[in-house]
């Protein structure tokens, strides 16, 4: 599909649940966020149907998100069904890694290609603080299992916040040098509870500068996966570092994605309030041609770019939208 700005839209991010086993401070309050009722959430067979329709419109890549997607029952079955859909070239998943150790090999066997794991600190106590309940040992078990299962390249998503974990930038770079891991530093965005954290923002150029003064960097185009990161190899290292810059140097001109929320809404842009209901027509028995037209309408509504730098704020938590 092509939008009104001649961008090819071939990537669908599907939030398969709004539930999460953690309460990360920049994502949601300690009490969590209001959850949708069971009937409000797309059923697995509905997700598979919409994925099949999306593939028919030109979607070739799907990423499963949440919430935390691995808390969804029968997620392995869902992956297997999605992997069997003609036209879908890649199924990937973003997770906090807590349950990945137990599921990595089953997910790989079902057809999952690779994983991104959210990890904002390498320190046990700090991890517990930021997640309010997590155990970093479980995350490392998940990382090792993902590598062993071949869910590669394994990428670690790191949101850097000033005064909290910016002292670990070089620690993460060292990890990428010593291990076959790909660290993606992501600029803090004004979404959910992070909307009130303006002073915590650290631009990617500052992060890159700190790293390059210690570890020489060279462009790493081999890791290109049609995503927004600018990737670099640490000379002599086993992994890489990448920088995702939604604030300082947005990548809207090459955006190729749609989002499907857990409650069945299509979002043309993460940073836009507009949503299009597709669950309602699906449950009302709409034919697949009508559902395909709804996908096409969502694509036609994609804005040219976001407006976060102009003070726009997303009131919904990332777990509600689908990160």
Curated annotation (Swiss-Prot):
Binds 2 [4Fe-4S] clusters. Binds 1 [4Fe-4S] cluster coordinated with 3 cysteines and an exchangeable S-adenosyl-L-methionine and 1 [4Fe-4S] cluster coordinated with 3 cysteines and the GTP-derived substrate. Its EC number is 4.1.99.22. CDD domains: Radical_SAM, Twitch_MoaA. S-adenosyl-L-methionine binds at residues 26, 67, 118, 189. It is an enzyme of class 4 (lyase). SUPFAM superfamilies: Radical SAM enzymes. Residues 4-226 form the Radical SAM core domain. Gene3D superfamilies: Aldolase class I. Catalyzes the cyclization of GTP to (8S)-3',8-cyclo-7,8-dihydroguanosine 5'-triphosphate. This is GTP 3',8-cyclase. It comes from Moorella thermoacetica (strain ATCC 39073 / JCM 9320). The gene is moaA.
């Amino acid at each position: 599909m092509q939008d009104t700005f001649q961008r090819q839209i071939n990537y669908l991010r599907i939030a398969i649940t709004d539930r999460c086993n953690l309460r990360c401070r920049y994502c949601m309050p300690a009490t969590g966020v209001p959850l949708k009722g069971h009937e409000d959430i797309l059923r697995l067979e509905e997700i598979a149907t919409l994925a099949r329709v999306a593939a028919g419109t030109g979607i070739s890549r799907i990423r499963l998100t949440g919430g935390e997607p691995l808390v969804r029952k029968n997620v392995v079955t869902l992956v297997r069904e999605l992997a069997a859909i003609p036209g879908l070239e890649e199924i990937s998943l973003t997770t906090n890694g807590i349950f990945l150790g137990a599921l990595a090999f089953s997910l790989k066997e079902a057809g999952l290609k690779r994983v991104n794991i959210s990890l904002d600190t390498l320190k046990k106590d700090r991890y517990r603080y930021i997640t309010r309940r997590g155990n970093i040992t479980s995350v490392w078990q998940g990382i090792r299992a993902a590598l062993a299962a071949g869910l590669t390249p394994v990428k670690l998503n790191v949101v850097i916040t000033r005064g909290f974990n910016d002292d670990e930038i070089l620690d993460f770079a060292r990890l990428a040098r010593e291990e076959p891991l790909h660290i993606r530093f992501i600029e803090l965005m004004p979404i959910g509870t992070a909307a009130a954290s303006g002073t915590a923002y650290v631009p990617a150029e500052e992060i890159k500068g700190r790293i390059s003064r210690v570890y020489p960097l060279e462009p790493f185009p081999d890791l290109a996966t049609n995503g927004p990161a600018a990737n670099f190899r640490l000379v002599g290292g086993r992994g890489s570092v990448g920088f995702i810059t939604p604030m300082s140097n947005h990548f809207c001109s090459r955006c190729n994605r749609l989002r499907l929320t857990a409650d069945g809404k299509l979002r043309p842009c993460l940073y836009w309030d507009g949503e299009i209901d597709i669950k309602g027509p699906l449950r009302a028995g709409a034919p697949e041609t009508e559902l395909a037209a709804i996908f096409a309408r969502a694509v036609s509504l994609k804005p040219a770019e976001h407006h976060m730098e102009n003070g726009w704020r997303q009131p919904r938590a990332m777990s509600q939208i689908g990160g």
